[in-house]
Amino acid sequence: MDTLKLEIVTPEGLIFQGDVKSVTFPGEEGEFGVLPKHASLLSLLKPGVIEIELPDGKKESIVINWGHVNVSENQATALVEGAVPLEGTTESEIAKKIEEAKKLIESASENKAALATVEARIEKAAKIV
């Protein structure tokens, strides 16, 4: 199975690194998916959720405030200002991550409609975790 190498980096350090089956980014012009052997591109990222599908079929979600992504044939590197992985082993840990993610998004945008949309996506992504 073909995979894509994905890195998500913030000023504080590496948030995610690994092989993935696919990844969906919140691009400035709309969401877009990346699969192995994708055409090269550079895109701005807006506040939203990066959705990752791992080779074993499991899914991970990382909320970001803004940044950019550089995609080449078999690698995608996202440099973002802030990120919160939606993960946890207990409901309280996941609830804490959801609150952190909402605060991150609220600090990145004043557009109330966009905030509501992203917050709904955060809640949906957290249910998958």
Curated annotation (Swiss-Prot):
HAMAP family from the entry? ATP_synth_epsil_bac (MF_00530)
Q: Where does the record place it?
A: Cell inner membrane
- Would I find Ion transport among this entry's keywords? yes
Signal peptide stretch:
none
Q: Does the record carry Acyltransferase as a key word?
A: no
Question: What is the species listed in this Swiss-Prot or TrEMBL entry?
Answer: Nitratiruptor sp. (strain SB155-2)
NCBIfam families xrefs: ATP_synt_epsi
Q: Name one GO molecular function term.
A: proton-transporting ATP synthase activity, rotational mechanism
Print the keywords alphabetically. Answer: ATP synthesis, Cell inner membrane, Cell membrane, CF(1), Hydrogen ion transport, Ion transport, Membrane, Transport
As for family, the record states:
Belongs to the ATPase epsilon chain family.
Task: Tell me the membrane topology, using the record's own terms.
Answer: Peripheral membrane protein
Q: What is the protein name given in its UniProt record?
A: ATP synthase epsilon chain
Q: Gene3D superfamilies per the record?
A: F0F1 ATP synthase delta/epsilon subunit, N-terminal (2.60.15.10)
The record's section on InterPro entries has: ATP_synth_F1_dsu/esu, ATP_synth_F1_dsu/esu_N, ATPsynth_dsu/esu_N
What does this chain do? Answer: Produces ATP from ADP in the presence of a proton gradient across the membrane.
A GO term from the CC aspect: plasma membrane
Assembly description: F-type ATPases have 2 components, CF(1) - the catalytic core - and CF(0) - the membrane proton channel. CF(1) has five subunits: alpha(3), beta(3), gamma(1), delta(1), epsilon(1). CF(0) has three main subunits: a, b and c.
